[in-house]
Design a protein with these regions (language model features):
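Tryptophan-centric aromatic hotspots in well-structured domains and transmembrane helices
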Residues: 1, 45-46, 86
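N-terminal glycine/serine-rich phosphate-binding loop of ATP-dependent small-molecule kinases
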Residues: 1-41, 65, 69
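Structural signal for hydrophobic packing residues in well-ordered secondary-structure cores
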Residues: 3, 7-11, 59-62, 88-95
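Short, acidic Gly/Pro/Ser/Thr-rich loop/turn segments
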Residues: 27-29, 52, 94
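Short alpha-helix plus adjacent loop in nuclease-associated cores
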Residues: 44-60
Length: 102
């Protein structure tokens, strides 16, 4: 409703919106269907460490330093990228929806 109200107030069509930023507490991560806005899974809250095995695989591959140099952030299950990788590996719809692109 908020987004609809803002679009209406701005006097634009929804197709003109190129992106949307959402702020949340810490590094909580969520994925949703861009066509209908429905979540594809429950959000992973910032302190959840379910992506620790993904981080271990990255560490074992020798790419942890590259992650740190590229992002400025040490590899961690709290890092949103590791949560996104968890969604990609564990929620059937996520890779399918992600591969569809914009």
């Amino acid at each position: 409703k908020v987004v609809r109200d803002v679009i209406e107030k701005a006097g634009i069509r929804r197709e003109q919106v190129a992106g949307l930023g959402i702020s949340n507490q810490r590094e909580t991560s969520a994925v949703w269907d861009r066509t209908d806005g429905h979540p594809l899974a429950d959000a992973i809250v910032w302190q959840c460490s379910r992506a620790k095995d993904i981080c271990a695989r990255v560490e074992e591959s020798g790419k942890a330093e590259w992650v740190r140099r590229t992002t400025g952030i040490n590899l961690s299950p709290y890092f949103p990228a590791s949560k996104l990788a968890w969604f990609m590996e564990n929620v059937k719809e996520v890779p399918q929806k992600a591969s569809g692109g914009p």
